[in-house]
Every structure is written in C-alpha cells, then in structure tokens.
A protein has these predicted regions:
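Histidine/acidic residue-rich metal-binding segments in metalloenzymes
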Residues: 131-300
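Histidine-rich, glycine-flanked metal-binding segment
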Residues: 1-50
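Metal-associated gating/positioning segment near the N- to mid-region
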Residues: 46-111
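Active-site mouth loops of central-metabolism enzymes
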Residues: 55-68, 89, 117-130, 151, ...
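Divalent metal-coordination and catalytic microenvironments
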Residues: 9, 24, 45, 56, ...
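A glycine-rich helix N-cap at a beta->alpha junction
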Residues: 106-122
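C-terminal cap of metal-dependent C-N hydrolases
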Residues: 315-318, 371-426
C-alpha cells in the first residue's frame, strides 16, 4: 500500500504538524516525521480538515442525468473537499423503494470519488399520501437512516407523526423541507419589501416557521429525531433554539448561499438567484451566521441543486429553483464565518464534517485527524483568492450564483481512505 506524508499542515487550524497516511489509514500525526518511501506533500500554511460531509445533495440520477449524474456529482464533491454526500430522494423514479436506493448506493461505489449515502423518501412518490418503504430501505444494502421528501414538505401532521414513529424503531431521522404549501402557492421569492416592489409572489417566513414549530413539537411528543433542512429565517432560528432548550431531539442545517446572499439580488431578475427556500433579508443572514456560530444551527449543507442551462437561461417565472454548491461551499464558509471571526477552522470541521457525519451516521467520516483513523481528509489553502469560473466546475451544471465573484480558499487535496481524489486542486 502506498504512503503519503503531508508535511507542515495546520491540523484543524492548529500548530503545524506532519500527517503520515499508510494505505487507507492515518498512521501517525506529529512533527519531524521521516518521509521514507512516502510521497511528500509540502503543506506549509495550509489547513488540514477531516473530509467534508454533505447531508443534503441532489445528484439527480436516476432520471435527470442531463443536469447531474452520480459520477459528475461526486467529482464535484471531491473537488469541494467532500468525502461523503447524502443523495436526496427526488429523482425519477423517486428513491422510495429498496431497489432505487440500492441503485444510487451502487453508482456511488462505482464512482470512487466520494461515498454516497442515499436518502429515502418519506412518502411514496413524494406525494405525502402514503408512507414509503422506510423499513425496507433501512434493511437494504444501502442501509438508509435519513428520510426526506425534500423539494416538498411532509405537510400532513398525521403523516409526519407516523414517519417519526416509524424511524424511531431503528434510530432513523426525518429531514423536513419546511414549507407550508398553502402559504407559498405561486411564490417566486422571499415575501418582503423587494417582492412588493418587483411585483413577484412572496414566500413568507411564516411558511417555514409554522412547519418547524409543528414538527419540533411532534418530535417531542413521539420522542423521535427531526432534522430541519435549509433553515433560512431568523424566526426559524428562534424556534429551533427554543426546542433545543427543552431537550427536543432536533438538528438543523443552513446552506452557504443563505449565509451570504440576500433577496436584494433578485432585483437583477437573474434566475441564478432563484432558490427554495428563497434568499432572505440581511437580518436573516446575520441571524443564521450567529446561530451557526453558537450551535443552534448544527451544520452547513449545500443543497447542491444542479439544473441544465435551459432551465435557468429563461425568464424568472419559468426558471427552476436551485443552485449548485459543492465546489464553492467551503470558500463561502471561510468568507462568512472564518474571516468574520465567528468560527475558527476547528469550528468549520465540526459544522461541515463531525456533526453531519453523526447526524447521518456516515461511518468512517467526520473522524479526528489522528493515528488509526480512516484517511478521509481535505487540505485547504486559505490564502488563495480567485474569481469563481463555472466553466471549470466538475459538476455537469453551471447554475452558480457566484460566477465572477472573488471567494477565498481552495481545496488543494482530497483523500478518500488514503487515495487522492484531488491533487494540486485538480481531480486525480
């Protein structure tokens, strides 16, 4: 088995250390480690993190391979420093059976760029009428533990209660896309001053907050786990904070774009800024940053949502909702959280690797950078500055809101069980 010596990297942003990888495992961490026959990476000034874990990725396969495949999506993930992603169920066919989740799991194994853990649908066809085969998906080769109808809300309270009760039996979690559909019919952007001035249908904060309030109470009643996808409002932060103070088993995620962008960008009518939940106000952005810093929000998740060119290069009302995010997430977090002093690099490792791995049960991921642990690692150059060029993306889609924007940081190397998937910033 080959050996690699990472020399002089700041492990989790701490003091410079050497890390010796032997095969799939970290063999030694310390200073002055002799290289021997190992390949040496000079990493002075760089940050070494555990491989990132994304709890919310849309890989689109099966069914929408025109926008992404498991292969292209995992290549994008590796480029962004990820060693594991959780693939959402809103594919065609929907991942609501053991057969479909096993197909996605197998495709992930074949890609080799990062581990893929399928997320199972909560309801058949994401229609909210009948529970999907939760037990069968859990017992399948994919071993599904996270279930979500993401893209749609499990808006029926009885259905949500039944789902929470069912997954409690095997320690699963329901990841809720919090959106009361009757309050968002025809919505095109955040409801507020900008939507009123532009004459666009508004997506009110209460449509998210009312579902979160209901579901944390249901989770408390059932004694089960609920995870809130892409939390986006200051009010949602307060509800989750209250729920945690009561000991309710709730976790929450925020996307990079909700940490940086606001609804003011919609004035351009550029559909690249159309996303669900929508970009909110500056007040919401600041509340989300503070909540991620203090732990009210547990993790950063990309909600990587690729779309083909024709679904975004059109008028606003006809455009699809969603943004790609795997290849820019870490840079946005560096800008919004590290360079503002809200998180250090150890905090980034916690929010983007340790905690998502625990929530999703990603075995071998989100582990300490120490001897005997799996060598799932990400090396980052924080001093790098560069404009985002989607033409260089590994993703099949280019719908990024950051095109031409200068962002800090660059993933130079990614290791999946000791094998380099990214070398010097390029896919291996």
């Amino acid at each position: 088995m080959s050996k690699t010596l990472i020399r002089g990297a700041k492990v989790l942003g701490g003091e410079p250390q050497d890390v010796l990888i032997d095969g799939a495992t970290v063999e030694r961490v310390g200073t002055g480690i002799e290289a021997g026959d190992a390949t040496v990476i000079e990493a002075q000034g760089q940050i070494l993190l555990p491989g990132l874990v994304d709890l919310h990725t849309h890989l689109r396969e099966p069914g929408r391979e025109d926008s992404e495949t498991v292969l292209t999506g995992t290549r994008a993930a590796a480029s962004g420093g990820y060693t594991a992603v959780f693939a959402m169920a809103n594919t065609f066919p929907v991942a609501d059976t053991a057969g479909v989740v096993e197909q996605v799991y197998r495709l992930g194994k074949e890609s080799g760029y990062c581990d893929v853990q399928p997320i199972g649908a909560v309801t058949v066809g994401l229609e909210g009428k009948k529970l999907a085969e939760l037990g069968a998906m859990h017992e399948s080769a994919a071993g599904v533990t996270v279930f979500s109808d993401d893209g749609k809300c499990v808006d029926d309270a009885v259905m949500m209660r039944r789902a929470l009760e069912y997954v409690k039996a095997f320690g699963g979690v329901i990841a809720q896309h919090a959106q009361e559909p009757r309050l968002t019919e025809g919505a095109q952007m955040n409801e507020g001053i900008v939507s009123a001035e532009l004459g666009l249908g508004g997506w009110p904060a209460v449509a998210e907050e009312s579902i979160i309030a209901r579901d944390v109470l249901l989770a408390e009643h059932v004694g089960s786990r609920v995870h809130i996808c892409h939390l986006s409002t200051a009010g949602s932060v307060e509800i989750v904070r209250w729920a945690k103070s009561r000991g309710i088993d709730v976790t929450a995620e925020v996307t990079p774009h909700h940490l940086l962008l606001t609804d003011e960008l919609v004035r351009s009518y550029n559909p690249v800024y159309k996303v669900n939940p929508p970009l909110r106000t500056e007040r919401d952005v600041m509340a989300l940053r503070e909540a991620l810093a203090d732990g009210t929000i547990d993790i950063v998740a990309t909600d990587h949502a690729p779309h083909p060119h024709e679904d975004k290069d059109c008028e606003w009302a006809a455009a699809a909702m969603g943004m790609v995010g795997l290849e820019t997430a870490l840079s946005v977090v560096q800008q919004t959280m590290v360079e503002t002093g809200l998180l250090d690099w150890a905090g980034v490792a916690d929010r983007m690797s340790f905690r998502p791995a625990v929530i999703g049960g990603a075995k071998g991921h989100g582990r300490p950078v120490s001897a005997g642990e799996p060598a799932n690692l990400t090396l980052v150059d924080p001093a790098y500055r560069g404009a985002v060029d989607p033409a260089g993306f590994a993703s099949r889609s280019r719908n990024t809101p950051y095109e031409g924007r200068e962002l800090p940081g660059r993933v130079t190397h990614t290791f999946l069980r000791g094998r380099a998937t990214v070398v010097d910033g390029k896919l291996a």
